[in-house]
């Protein structure tokens, strides 16, 4: 065009700025910085929590994703403590029961292995704590009705099957709503033809897992807006062949660490298992003593700042109707986690101080991206799933992927490939570069 090179460079810079703006709009960061650099250093200098020790032991035992042991460690503490430790708040009394959902892509992440290792410890301490691994709604309610104030774990390795049955089976109708209320410890009364089931002071813990694509395929927007899905803390991990380890014998060091962990759990049980006498009329009744947790003023201030930060992120996102309740509920789960960490120290009183609150927020920092990923990808159609698969293939390669290779690997016709690549291109997710008779595909956003 006989224009100077400076004009061409200005056009290139403007085009680059437009692409950057589109990437920021479509791909907002989910890495929430919830701690300052000073707070992060303070947390790193603190002694290891029970969860940290459990994660370290789990990593030494095999190649299961370490994130899964984090979920297992908190589930153990919740099973041990949520029946006797309560946190009085201005909104009511909070029970530190946590729900975890472990999502995996393949067997290399060892989802079931990590869950089994945690539950083996729980069952050694309390063989009766597992309510069920499957069953009807009535069966679950009957099990809870017989154990008021006692924690009960619903442990299911493949939760996608239950979600599918809830949608299809009439006898499971209303199960999602009932589980949501049980999480909050609400009184439930179910009137059946032959009996009446009354549940008082339930303490329900859910420890579930599943293949990520199957779980997301079964979740719909109603599950999110009703509050059922946001009550879960989601843990995700991807397969890493570099972490693969062949099976071998247990070493003495590994066994000793497990014994130390079990000894700590036994001390927890002994510390928090005590009876007290209450008077009902002229009668004296023995019941388990309840320990009231509290937060220092500094811990309350830091928690409220953290909760406000989470809610603001949800409100300012592109879809506040799903992100806001999800992050708000995750904030409450973080408060429960802080109570569990404080109670695990077996001091004379359960008090959450500022360092303990910072430890809990550090865990939440890793949980938040998983929750956001789940609600953002819930209920995707088959075509959207195909777009995701192909985009991730392109994203994994820093040198680009040939269009012909994508068509061969995913058995695409020319028309199907045109539709998929045009869609990804117009969404600002990929860049297409001519390469001979075909084209090379690059992701505009590459995982670090």
Which ranges hold each PLM region?
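N-terminal helical hairpins
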Residues: 7
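Phosphate-handling catalytic cores of nucleic-acid transaction enzymes
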Residues: 10-448
């Amino acid at each position: 065009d006989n224009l100077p090179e400076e004009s061409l460079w200005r056009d290139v810079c403007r085009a680059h700025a437009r692409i950057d703006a589109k990437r920021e709009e479509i791909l907002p960061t989910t890495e929430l910085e919830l701690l300052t650099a000073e707070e992060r250093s303070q947390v790193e200098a603190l002694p290891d929590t029970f969860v940290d020790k459990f994660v370290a032991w789990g990593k030494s035992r095999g190649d299961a994703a370490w994130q899964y042991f984090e979920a297992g460690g908190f589930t153990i503490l919740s099973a041990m403590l949520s029946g006797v430790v309560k946190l009085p708040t201005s909104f009511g009394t909070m029970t530190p029961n946590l729900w975890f959902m472990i999502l995996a892509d393949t067997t290399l992440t060892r989802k079931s292995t990590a869950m089994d290792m945690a539950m083996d410890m729980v069952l050694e301490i309390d063989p009766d704590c597992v309510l069920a691994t499957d069953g009807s709604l009535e069966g679950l309610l009957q099990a809870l009705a017989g154990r008021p104030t006692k924690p009960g774990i619903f442990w299911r390795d493949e939760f996608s099957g239950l979600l599918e049955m809830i949608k299809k089976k009439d006898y499971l109708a209303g199960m999602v709503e009932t589980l949501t209320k049980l999480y909050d410890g609400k009184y439930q009364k179910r009137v059946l033809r032959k009996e009446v089931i009354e549940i008082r002071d339930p303490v329900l813990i859910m420890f579930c897992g599943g293949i990520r694509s199957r779980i997301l395929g079964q979740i719909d927007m109603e599950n999110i807006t009703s509050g059922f899905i946001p009550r879960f803390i989601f843990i995700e991990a991807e397969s890493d062949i570099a972490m693969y380890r062949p099976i071998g014998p247990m070493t003495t060091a590994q066994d000793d660490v497990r014994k130390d962990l079990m000894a700590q759990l036994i001390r927890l049980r002994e510390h928090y298992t005590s009876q007290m006498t209450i008077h009902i009329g002229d009668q004296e009744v023995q019941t388990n003593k309840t320990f009231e947790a509290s937060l220092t003023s500094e811990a309350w201030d830091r928690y409220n700042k953290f909760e406000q930060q989470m809610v603001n992120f949800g409100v300012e996102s592109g879809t506040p109707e799903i992100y806001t309740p999800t992050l708000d509920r995750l904030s409450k789960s973080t408060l429960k986690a802080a109570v569990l960490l404080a109670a695990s120290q077996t001091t004379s009183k359960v008090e959450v101080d500022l360092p303990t609150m910072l430890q809990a927020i550090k865990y939440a920092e890793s949980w938040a991206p998983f929750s956001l990923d789940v609600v953002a990808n819930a209920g995707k159609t088959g075509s959207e799933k195909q777009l995701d698969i192909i985009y991730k293939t392109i994203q994994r390669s820093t040198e680009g992927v040939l269009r012909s290779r994508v068509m061969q690997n995913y058995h695409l016709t020319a028309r199907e490939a045109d539709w998929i690549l045009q869609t990804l291109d117009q969404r600002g997710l990929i860049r297409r570069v001519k390469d001979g008779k075909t084209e090379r595909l690059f992701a505009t956003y590459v995982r670090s």
